[in-house]
Amino acid sequence: IIGADVRNGMIASHGWTNQSKVNAVNLIKGFNPSIINSIIYTDITRDGSLQGVNLEQTINFAKSIPHPVIASGGVSSIEDISNLSKQISNGVEGVVIGRALYDKKFTFADALKSIKLVK
């Protein structure tokens, strides 16, 4: 699994303090595909903010690479989980939930139920 910390389509590093000019999609496409199982795509403009997932940007990233994507950053509601779970055909196969669980916006059981309702 490779983690891609992304701000406006570009890779960020060093605890997100270094904004590169490296396009995230181009970087991932440059790796040998046989060594990659999936990509954790973190939208660092939303991570920990509870602003909601940037669904459009996440889908665009997932559709542009040949690997399953685990979405991260901004999850704030069951609706975010449900919307992401509908994107399996676009390459989004998982989600990282952090602050929303810590802040008790919903329970893990509720998140699982919302995924089962979509499938």
Enumerate the predicted regions with their spans.
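C-terminal helical cap(s) of enzyme catalytic domains, especially alpha/beta-barrels
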Residues: 85-119
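Short, well-ordered secondary-structure micro-motifs
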Residues: 12-15, 50-53, 81-83, 106-108
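Conserved anion-binding
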Residues: 1-47
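Conserved, mostly hydrophobic/aromatic
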Residues: 2, 39, 61, 84, ...
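Short, small-residue-enriched loops and turns at beta-alpha junctions
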Residues: 10, 46-51, 77, 103
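Thr-Gly-centered strand-to-loop micro-motif
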Residues: 14, 71-72, 97
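Catalytic cores of alpha/beta
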Residues: 56-91, 111
